[in-house]
C-alpha cells in the first residue's frame, strides 16, 4: 500500500515537474545526517549515521563589523563529538552556524546580515571557516541563517539585500573551501518570496550550484490542530510533498535534497508548551489523558490527543519508514533529523532513520 501511494501520488507528479528528466540517477549511498547540539545530553551513535552537523557556532559581529566566530557552549562537548570519528573513520562531521547569539561574551551586533553585506567580511569569514576545518579535521560547513530578509530572535536583517548577499556568501564559502569540504544550508520549505520591503528566504536557483546538500526543514510546517511534517496534507500550511515540489520546480537535483525529520511533537508555535520531544512522548504514553500513535492516512503521520482533542503531530518509526521508501523512490540524497538528544534512551528514531536509508527497497 505504501509503495502504491508513493509511486502513484508523488513520483508521477514530480516526474512531470523535473526539468532534467526524472530519476536518471538515483544514488545508492544515502545520507543520514544527525544534528547534535552543544546543549544536548547524549551523543549520536556513529555507526548509525553518515554525517553529524554540530550545532552551533555563532558569529561575533561588533557594531556591524565581523570579528570572528566561536562555538556555542563548552568546547568539551565539541571534542566529544569529534572523537566519534575514532569509532567510525567514514563519519563526516560538519559545523553548523546559527543566526542566534547565546554566548555570554557576545551580543547581536549585525550577524549574518551585516557580515554578508561586505565582500571583505565574507571572505574573512570563509577563510576562518577553512582554517577551523583544517584545525579540527572537520568535513564541512553548514549555514543555518533563518532566514535572510527576516528578523527572528532579535537578529539583524535587511530585506533589500539579504537574499542577494546570502548567495554571495555561499559563493565565497565554496571558493574558499574548494571541493574538499562539504557545504550545505538549512533550507526553508519554499523559494525566496517577495515582500513589501524586499525579499525573504534564499534564492534557491542562485545558491544550489555552490552547495552539496540542502537540509530541507520539512518540520514545523504547521501546528495543532494541523500536522507539522505530513507527507501530504490538505489542511496544513505546507507539507513534504509541496516542499520537495518547490525545489524540483527550480531544477534542484533530487540527490542534493535531504528530507527533514523532527524528533519531537509540535503542539504550537507559542505558549507554555510548544514542543514535546520523543523521549518525553515515551514517558507520557502511560498518562491516561494522552493518546499517542494515532494515524492519519492522508498525511501518513502519527498524532496525539490530549483529553480527546488533537494535541500535536510528530514522527515515529512507522512514519519514518514511509518517508524512507519515499526518499528512495524519488532518489533524494537522504534525510536529516533535528535533533539527536530528543530521541529516547533506546535511540528508537535514530535507528528508524538508519533503517529507512539503508533498507534495500528493490528486494
What are these regions (language model features)?
Residues 52, 95, 143, 173, ...:
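Conserved, mostly hydrophobic/aromatic
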Residues 30, 50, 89-93, 137-139, ...:
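Short, well-ordered coil/turn segments that N-cap beta-strands
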Residues 96-99, 103-110, 256-326, 346, ...:
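Glycan-binding loop/region signatures in secreted carbohydrate-active enzymes
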Residues 1-5:
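Positively charged n-region of N-terminal signal peptides that target proteins for export
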Residues 45-48, 77-81, 108-111, 121, ...:
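Stable alpha-helical elements in mature extracytoplasmic
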Residues 8-19:
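Bacterial N-terminal signal peptides
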Residues 25-133, 232:
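Glycan-recognition patch characteristic of GH18 chitinases/ENGases
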Residues 33, 60-76, 148-288:
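Substrate-binding surface in catalytic domains of secreted glycosidases
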Amino acid at each position: 500500500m505504501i509503495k502504491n501511494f508513493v509511486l502513484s501520488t508523488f513520483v508521477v507528479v514530480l516526474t512531470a515537474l523535473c526539468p532534467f528528466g526524472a530519476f536518471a540517477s538515483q544514488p545508492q549511498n544515502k545520507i543520514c545526517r544527525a544534528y547534535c547540539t552543544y546543549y544536548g545530553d547524549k551523543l549520536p551513535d556513529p555507526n548509525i549515521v553518515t554525517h553529524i552537523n554540530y550545532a552551533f557556532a555563532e558569529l561575533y559581529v561588533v557594531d556591524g563589523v565581523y570579528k570572528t566566530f566561536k562555538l556555542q557552549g563548552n568546547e568539551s562537548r565539541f571534542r566529544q563529538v569529534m572523537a566519534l570519528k575514532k569509532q567510525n573513520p567514514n563519519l563526516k562531521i560538519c559545523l553548523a552556524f546559527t543566526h542566534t547569539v547565546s554566548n555570554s561574551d557576545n551580543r547581536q551586533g549585525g550577524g549574518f546580515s551585516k557580515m554578508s553585506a561586505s565582500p571583505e567580511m565574507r571572505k574573512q569569514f570563509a577563510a576562518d571557516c577553512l582554517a577551523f576545518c583544517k584545525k579540527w579535521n572537520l568535513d564541512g560547513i553548514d549555514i543555518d541563517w533563518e532566514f535572510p530578509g527576516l528578523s527572528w530572535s532579535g537578529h539583524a536583517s535587511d530585506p533589500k539585500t539579504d537574499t542577494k548577499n546570502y548567495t554571495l556568501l555561499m559563493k565565497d564559502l565554496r571558493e574558499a573551501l574548494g571541493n574538499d569540504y562539504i557545504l550545505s544550508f538549512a533550507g526553508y520549505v519554499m523559494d525566496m518570496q517577495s515582500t513589501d520591503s524586499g525579499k525573504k528566504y534564499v534564492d534557491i536557483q542562485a545558491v544550489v550550484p555552490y552547495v552539496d546538500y540542502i537540509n530541507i526543514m520539512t518540520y514545523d510546517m504547521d501546528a495543532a490542530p494541523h500536522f507539522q511534517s505530513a507527507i501530504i496534507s490538505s489542511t496544513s500550511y505546507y507539507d513534504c510533498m509541496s516542499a520537495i515540489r518547490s525545489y524540483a520546480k527550480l531544477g534542484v537535483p533530487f540527490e542534493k535534497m535531504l528530507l527533514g525529520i523532527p524528533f519531537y511533537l509540535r503542539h504550537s508555535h507559542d505558549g507554555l508548551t510548544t514542543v514535546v520531544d520523543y523521549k518525553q512522548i515515551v514517558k507520557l504514553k502511560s498518562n491516561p489523558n494522552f493518546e499517542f500513535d494515532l494515524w492519519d492516512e492522508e498525511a501518513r503521520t502519527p498524532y496525539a490527543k490530549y483529553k480527546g482533542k488533537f494535541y500535536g503531530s510528530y514522527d515515529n518509526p512507522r512514519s519514518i519508514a514511509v518517508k524512507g521508501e519515499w526518499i528512495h523512490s524519488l532518489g533524494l540524497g537522504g534525510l536529516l533529523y533535528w535533533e539527536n538528544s530528543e530521541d529516547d534512551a533506546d535511540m528508537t528514531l535514530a535507528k528508524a532513520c538508519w533503517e529507512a536509508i539503508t533498507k534495500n527497497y528493490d528486494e
